[in-house]
Amino acid sequence: VPGQTAGVSVFTDDLISTTGLTRLQLAIAYLVGTGTSGLLLGAGGRAIDRHGSRVVAFAATVGLAATLLGLSVIGPMSTPVGLVVMSIGFGCLRFSGQGLLTLASRNMVAQWFDRRRGLVTAVSSAVASFALAASPALLLVLIDIDGFRTAWQIMALALVVVVGSIIITFYRVSPEAAGIEIDGRGRTAIPDEPEPGTSAPERTVLIIGTEHDATRAQALRDVRFWALTIPVAALSSTATAITFHIVDLGAELGLTDDEIVRIFVPIAFVSVPITLLTGWITDRVTPLFVAMAMTLAQLVMYPTIGLLDTRWGAVAAVITWGAAQGCFSALTSAAIPKVFGRRYLGAISGAQMSAMVIGSAIGPAFFALVQSITGGYRAALWLSMLLPAIALLLSIAGLRHDQHGDRRAHACR
């Protein structure tokens, strides 16, 4: 939560008043920091392939806790110094939290399941959705108790003690590394560590996936990768921007802070059953259908966010945001290993996560820029519809690609 936008947005006004930066300047720092972290996530994905999710997730947890402690002691700064400090702070926060810890956790789950991967990742994401939905209101309560500094310090302690313990206790690299086959179908000859006293030729080389799995370069040249990635990158960008400016957006619409942050809870209630449904669907058909559904939901969601002050607008925005969010898990956790395999899962998922994080970096700054020009956020919401429209066309192209491949495979038989 601390590295996600929902965990940052409630601290925005405190950061503005403490550092002396304007809202646009803080958004620019968020853009620079988050964009930089997105560029580094490709290396993070390769590190997961090399060292495993357990090591990377624990390192990310410690890094996130250290970042929160550092941010908790900031004070008034000149504009140039403030921009540099907050860019570094946001970069570390987003790289360790939203980026590396999330990527390592998703990959760990995806490595362990095949037959019901979509459903398992959906259940995991449903729990995370409720946590993220509840976090803004809970963090506001924590801030009200003793200020934003203490809130961040408490979260840093909880990360090391609670999350760190969970990672050490439960995270494992892959079924192959644990000496079993995926889905628990049987045993293999591959142990966690080589047996003492065995010679080099006797040691089995750990192989994950199959020789048919796509490399990162092959995936990036495949239209299906972009059909699966652009919808989640678009939602990351726009949803991050909305969440980052949620208090200011509420003021524009005549809503109080408490009224505007309450929309996240019904969004979670909508997204959870759809998350489970799309996970079930992904286990049975191509995830490109889920990508198409996500783009259609976004095309309705974005303009209706600007109508949250009306009853029908609020209902439409909550339903479509929940629907789009409900497709997220299927495309980020289950779709990549299903389409491209597990051998280079870290590298390919890292590329997808990079696009998402870079999108989430651009969104808040873009919305702040449009707001400074037009005096409101509605124009930014309408302009944000361009990416989902492009993604819809790519999804259709991806379906044609799959159909062509099926016909070719049938002809070979």
Task: Explain the meaning of each model-derived region.
Residues 239, 255, 259, 264-335:
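C-terminal transmembrane helical hairpin of 12-TM major facilitator-type secondary transporters
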Residues 62-79, 297-309:
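C-terminal ends and interior cores of transmembrane alpha-helices
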Residues 97-113, 327-340:
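Intracellular juxtamembrane helix-capping segments at the cytosolic ends
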Residues 4, 8-12, 217-275:
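Extracytoplasmic gate region of multi-pass secondary transporters
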Residues 81-100, 233, 313-327:
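Hydrophobic core of transmembrane alpha-helices in multi-pass small-molecule transporters
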Residues 152-169, 380-397:
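Symmetry-related core transmembrane helices of the 12-TM Major Facilitator Superfamily/SLC fold
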Residues 40-53, 274-286:
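Helix-to-loop junctions at the C-terminal end of transmembrane segments
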Residues 15-16, 47-48, 138-146, 250-251, ...:
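Interfacial helix-cap and linker-helix signal at transmembrane-aqueous boundaries
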